[in-house]
Every structure is written in C-alpha cells, then in structure tokens.
Amino acid sequence: MNDEQLLRYSRHLLLEDIDIAGQEKLLNSHVLIIGAGGLGSACAPYLAAAGVGQITLVDHDRVELTNLQRQIMHQNNSVGMSKVWSGKRFLNNLNPGITIHAIEQKADEALLEELVMQVSVVIDCTDNFITRHLINRISLKHGKTLVSGASIGFDAQISVFDFRQASSPCYACVFPPDPHFVETSCASMGVFSPLVGIIGSLQAAQALQILIGFGEPLLGRLLIWNARNSQIDEIKIQRNLDCPVCGAH
C-alpha cells in the first residue's frame, strides 16, 4: 500500500483482525453486486469505502423519484439515469482508488455465467425470487460464496451460502422454487427505508469478513429482522438432501 492508502484505511489497520494483510486482501479482491437499488445502495458504498479493489455492479433499471426514499446511492439529479452509472459516479467520488465496473444489463443466465466466475464473492441485492434462484444456482455451479439479502415492508433477512464447501446448504434449501409463487415488490407492498440500509450494510460486513477471513459469518444461518419491534431471530439452515438445486452436489 502507498502512503495515501495507509492513511485512508488507517482505521482498518488498527483492527487486529484486519491489519495490513487483511486490507491488502480487500484491495486485491473482486466482488459482484447484483442490484443497485435499496440493498445495493447501502452495500456498495461500504465495500467501496473499505477498499475492495474491484466492484462489478449489475442492474438494468433506471432511477425513479420513488427510489430516492431509500436508495441513497442515487440523488435528485440521477432521476432518469441508469442505476449502475449513477452508482458508479457515486462510488468513484467516494473512493477514486478502486475500480467500478458498471453493467447496465438484466442479470440473466448468460451474463451471470460470465461474471460470477470472475469474482470472489457474489452479493444478491435483487428484489425478486426468480433472479435470486438464478444467482443461487450459478454461484453454486462455480463454487462461489453468496451473500443473500432481502427486504420488504418491515421485514428483512440475510444469509450466507459458502459454495466452496460441499456441505453448504443453498438458497433453494430455505426457499424452494415454486412456479405458482406470486411475486411481491416494494412498489406494491412498500418498504421501511432504513431497513434496506441495515441489511445492505450487513451484506457488506459479511462480504468483508469472508474476503479477509475473520469472525463467524452467517454460514448456515438465516438472520431475520423485524423493524416494527427491532426483534432479531436466527434460524439454522440445514442442507436439504432432496433440494432440486444442491441435493446432488
């Protein structure tokens, strides 16, 4: 690290679990964030500020006025702009010493197959089950660690699936694919604005722990947050041997 980096990341360097070696791991890391909305708007800035060397941001949406209630990576002058380019502008201003890749495309199977294999950690900040299941399947296929978060109304959840370990459960073990499932969204159900910030920040924290290799990430655990009463519950996740996605791996 150069002198500017030593100063910028000095508060990390004081932490025994991070120190210079851990910070250098971050600077040499590449993370994929899928979704530049509410969760991504909290997750991406903390990863950028922490010094993750490369961040690939994927989203096909454009910023709308209704997004600004919670998506703090975007501003009034971002309305109508691509979310990933708005996000790239924000993150570059926050930390010009890292690289932000903006991919203005829908996260379909072909794109994810190309991107997932290039990164160390995949962070799911999307808002629908179809995409979450696709991200889960491709992360499993390539043996990547997946940090999954979701938030709607006053309820949210986060978990980590480490597909470097053959014994790891997957997202489908907890939420099996259901062709008859009716999607809900913030547009129809609403969302408590600070909640996406809490979960997105936790996603960033989990990713940093995994990249550096310290502490006890939420492996095999689902953390559930109720913002009405600030109640936090934790559920242990067991691998489902009959899971249609990971049951054979």
Stretch-by-stretch model annotation:
Residues M1-H249:
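Adenine nucleotide-associated cytosolic modules
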